[in-house]
């Protein structure tokens, strides 16, 4: 477990405060998890962002009438801190009985508070249910590898040694799997996700990639670090000209977390999958 997470509200009984309380936000430094992967803030081999979507966003108009909306937040992958998810939920709940003059005022407050917690500017969009409903759900790009026939017996830790490639062939492709699962390092609750790998480099053996993804099944780590580990393991193996790893996780507590790590600029839109 991350030492800072021990002091977070995650896994503990919490009072649900319904009036604006920005102090509820609990930042967790990324440095310890970066160090586990041999990284520092100065040596990150990727660009990226963590997309968060909130489906339980509500506040009051000056008249006292409630409003509901969907919040979209983008936290830079190189920000000093992640925001612990339960504290994020508690903070958003504290808006429920708080009046705001208009949506712009709410967005400005969210930008201020979330940027202070993350240690870097956070993008915020407050969207109407109608707008999000019109977008529907999308399918992941590329080839789904989930129907490949594999045998698996070890689920405790990620196993990069399973990954194989053909160095004699250079390909550019996009593949995805819906079989990503890991566990919360604090509560041990399951985190279910789908992951996309897009790259140009040595041809990756798809069955070995699926075996590797399944090896995360009992691994305990935060969403962000799972994606970073996948990115680094693939980068070491493939030595690619370009590489993107993007995961979309099933929501918990009204929030879903979708980390994106890439050698390229962030391009993928924040569109929901069928499990989101």
UniProtKB/Swiss-Prot annotation:
<feature type="active site" description="Thioimide intermediate">
    <location>
        <position position="184"/>
    </location>
</feature>
<comment type="subunit">
    <text>Homodimer.</text>
</comment>
<protein>
    <recommendedName>
        <fullName>NADPH-dependent 7-cyano-7-deazaguanine reductase</fullName>
        <ecNumber>1.7.1.13</ecNumber>
    </recommendedName>
</protein>
<comment type="similarity">
    <text>Belongs to the GTP cyclohydrolase I family. QueF type 2 subfamily.</text>
</comment>
<dbReference type="InterPro" id="IPR029139">
    <property type="entry name" value="QueF_N"/>
</dbReference>
<keyword id="KW-0560">Oxidoreductase</keyword>
<comment type="function">
    <text>Catalyzes the NADPH-dependent reduction of 7-cyano-7-deazaguanine (preQ0) to 7-aminomethyl-7-deazaguanine (preQ1).</text>
</comment>
<dbReference type="InterPro" id="IPR029500">
    <property type="entry name" value="QueF"/>
</dbReference>
<dbReference type="Pfam" id="PF14819">
    <property type="entry name" value="QueF_N"/>
</dbReference>
<feature type="active site" description="Proton donor">
    <location>
        <position position="191"/>
    </location>
</feature>
<feature type="binding site">
    <location>
        <begin position="85"/>
        <end position="86"/>
    </location>
    <ligand>
        <name>NADPH</name>
    </ligand>
</feature>
<feature type="binding site">
    <location>
        <begin position="252"/>
        <end position="253"/>
    </location>
    <ligand>
        <name>NADPH</name>
    </ligand>
</feature>
<dbReference type="InterPro" id="IPR043133">
    <property type="entry name" value="GTP-CH-I_C/QueF"/>
</dbReference>
<dbReference type="InterPro" id="IPR050084">
    <property type="entry name" value="NADPH_dep_7-cyano-7-deazaG_red"/>
</dbReference>
<dbReference type="Pfam" id="PF14489">
    <property type="entry name" value="QueF"/>
</dbReference>
<keyword id="KW-0671">Queuosine biosynthesis</keyword>
<keyword id="KW-0521">NADP</keyword>
<dbReference type="GO" id="GO:0006400">
    <property type="term" value="P:tRNA modification"/>
</dbReference>
<dbReference type="InterPro" id="IPR016428">
    <property type="entry name" value="QueF_type2"/>
</dbReference>
<dbReference type="GO" id="GO:0033739">
    <property type="term" value="F:preQ1 synthase activity"/>
</dbReference>
<dbReference type="GO" id="GO:0005737">
    <property type="term" value="C:cytoplasm"/>
</dbReference>
<feature type="binding site">
    <location>
        <begin position="223"/>
        <end position="224"/>
    </location>
    <ligand>
        <name>substrate</name>
    </ligand>
</feature>
<comment type="pathway">
    <text>tRNA modification; tRNA-queuosine biosynthesis.</text>
</comment>
<keyword id="KW-0963">Cytoplasm</keyword>
<dbReference type="GO" id="GO:0008616">
    <property type="term" value="P:queuosine biosynthetic process"/>
</dbReference>
<feature type="binding site">
    <location>
        <begin position="83"/>
        <end position="85"/>
    </location>
    <ligand>
        <name>substrate</name>
    </ligand>
</feature>
């Amino acid at each position: 477990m991350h030492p800072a997470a021990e002091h977070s509200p995650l896994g503990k009984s919490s009072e649900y405060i319904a009036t604006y309380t920005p102090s509820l936000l609990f930042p967790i430094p990324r440095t310890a998890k970066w160090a586990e992967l041999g990284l520092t803030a100065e040596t990150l081999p990727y660009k990226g962002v963590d997309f968060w979507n909130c489906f339980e966003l509500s506040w009051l108009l000056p008249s006292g009438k409630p409003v509901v909306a969907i919040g979209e937040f983008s936290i830079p992958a190189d920000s000093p801190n992640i925001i612990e998810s339960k504290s994020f939920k508690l903070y958003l709940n504290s808006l429920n009985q708080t009046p705001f003059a208009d949506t712009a005022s709410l967005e400005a407050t969210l930008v201020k508070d979330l940027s202070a917690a993350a240690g870097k500017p956070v993008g915020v969009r407050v969207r109407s249910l109608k707008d999000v409903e019109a977008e529907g759900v999308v399918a992941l790009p590329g080839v789904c590898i989930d129907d490949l026939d594999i045998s698996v017996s070890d689920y405790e830790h990620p196993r990069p040694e399973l990954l194989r490639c053909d160095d004699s062939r250079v390909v550019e492709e996009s593949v995805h799997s819906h079989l990503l699962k890991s566990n919360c390092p604090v509560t041990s609750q399951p985190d279910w996700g789908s992951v996309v790998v897009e790259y140009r480099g040595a041809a990756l053996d798809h069955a070995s990639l699926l075996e590797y993804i399944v090896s995360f099944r009992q691994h305990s780590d935060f969403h962000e670090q799972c994606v970073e580990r996948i990115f680094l393991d693939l980068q070491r193996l493939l030595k690619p000209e370009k590489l993107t790893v993007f995961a979309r996780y099933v929501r918990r507590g009204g929030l879903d977390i979708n980390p994106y790590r890439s050698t390229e600029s962030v391009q993928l839109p924040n569109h929901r999958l069928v499990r989101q």
